[in-house]
């Protein structure tokens, strides 16, 4: 695409939907494609011509080039593994067992470590606590050196982003309130949409903040990024059809004060209650409708934010303040097909009370389970 997002300059057709891509020092792009027999493509960075094509596990979900190991690292979702691949030979050098369904990763500690987000809890649904865990992999030793559990009920982790100084990581996921009766949705009674903050120096969870307000859900958070100036966190809320824009500087100032016991908003009761407080981001977060359906991916440059509306096949651009929105249709919208329209409705929280959740909130990943032990009302409480 052109730098303003209004013109397609190069195009390539691949075997299946793209899950992720990375760039190596030569400028070539490495792309992993979805499917039980996943594929990894090497593309010319300028012409997008295919340089190589390699089979790559069961649903390769993310890919990164590491300047430390000078190799590619690929999360293999349904192998529950992280693979190291030699870009010259495209052979697998290392396989590392990690958590349940890894879907995203980001480098930190001077690019010597990877923080990996696993999509689902791996413990039995009768356990307590039950939550998604993050893996820390040390690249030089090629070992898992730590695990970080998110709050009880955390599930469907989708994305991880790290600030420029690699001080904090941000992970999108849900917190399901599965221990409560499923008799209402008000104030996130059943599910809340969450951004967890990881202290990368201490290698532990700092806290989790809710993207929602008390009266509105920011359903199905998908991709998260930190803008190049480190001033904003942008989350694509795919279910509520919007971007959530957070003042990152103000967020960390507020967290520091809250940890000292200050009442930083009228709703804050205590530090430990922040993951339950839908008012914590009041005044430092706003919502930007993308005017389409299914914003899943988001990226920022020095002066623009771009997001992709999955179901309406649009690239959306806007200023860093969320203004001057422009859209460019990239192909036949998925929503125009019968299957695509059904999938769109399944993931659409705007047809739910106050946008709190979509069908995919409890049944993520093509209508599968969320790994939690719900007590539904159909057979009594």
Regions found by a protein language model. Give the residues of each.
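Surface-exposed loop and turn segments in beta-propeller and other repeat-based domains
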Residues: 144-153, 201-219, 256-289, 329-344
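Short loop/turn segments immediately following beta-strands, especially the blade-tip
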Residues: 139, 186, 198-204, 246-262, ...
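The canonical Cys-X-X-Cys-His
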Residues: 354-366
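Residue-level detector of Asp-centered blade-edge/turn motifs that repeat once per structural unit
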Residues: 23-27, 66-69, 109-111, 164-166, ...
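Residue position within the beta-strands of beta-propeller blades
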Residues: 31-32, 74, 116-117, 171, ...
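Residue-level signature of beta-propeller blades and closely related beta-rich strand-turn architectures
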Residues: 35-36, 78, 120, 174-176, ...
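Short, conserved, GDST-rich strand-edge loop motifs in beta-rich repeat architectures
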Residues: 117-131, 171-192, 248-259
């Amino acid at each position: 695409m052109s730098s303003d997002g209004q013109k397609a300059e190069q195009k390539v057709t691949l075997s299946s939907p793209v899950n992720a891509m990375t760039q190596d020092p030569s400028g070539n792009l490495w792309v992993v494609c979805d499917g039980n027999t996943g594929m990894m493509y090497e593309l010319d960075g300028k012409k997008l011509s295919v340089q190589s094509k390699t089979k790559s596990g069961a649903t390769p979900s993310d890919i990164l080039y590491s300047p430390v190991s000078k190799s590619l690292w690929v999360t293999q979702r349904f192998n529950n593994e992280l693979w190291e691949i030699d870009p010259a030979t495209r052979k697998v050098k290392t396989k590392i067992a990690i958590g349940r369904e890894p879907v995203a990763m980001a480098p930190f500690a001077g690019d010597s470590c990877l923080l990996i987000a696993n999509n689902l809890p791996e413990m039995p649904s009768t356990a307590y606590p039950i939550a998604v865990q993050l893996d820390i992999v040390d690249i030089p030793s090629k070992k898992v050196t730590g695990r970080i559990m998110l709050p009880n009920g955390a599930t469907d982790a989708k994305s991880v982003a790290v600030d420029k100084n690699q001080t904090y990581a941000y992970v999108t996921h849900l917190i399901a309130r599965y221990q409560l009766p499923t008799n209402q949705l008000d104030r996130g009674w059943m599910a809340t949409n969450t951004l967890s903050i990881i202290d990368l120096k201490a290698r532990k969870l700092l806290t989790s903040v809710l993207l929602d307000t008390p009266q509105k859900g920011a359903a199905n958070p998908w991709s998260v990024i930190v803008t190049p100036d480190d001033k904003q966190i942008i989350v694509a809320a795919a279910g509520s059809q919007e971007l959530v824009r957070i003042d990152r500087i103000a967020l960390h100032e507020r967290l520091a004060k809250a940890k000292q016991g200050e009442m930083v908003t009228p709703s804050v009761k205590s530090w430990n209650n922040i993951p339950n407080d839908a008012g914590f981001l009041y005044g430092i977060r706003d919502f930007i409708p993308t005017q389409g359906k299914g914003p899943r991916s988001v990226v920022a440059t020095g002066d623009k934010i771009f997001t992709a509306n999955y179901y309406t096949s649009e690239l959306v651009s806007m200023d860093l303040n969320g203004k001057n929105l422009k859209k460019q249709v990239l192909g036949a919208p998925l929503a125009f097909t019968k299957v695509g329209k059904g999938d769109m409705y399944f993931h659409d929280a705007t047809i739910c009370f106050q946008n709190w959740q979509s069908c995919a909130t409890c049944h993520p990943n093509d209508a599968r389970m969320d790994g939690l032990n719900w007590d539904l009302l159909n057979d009594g409480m």
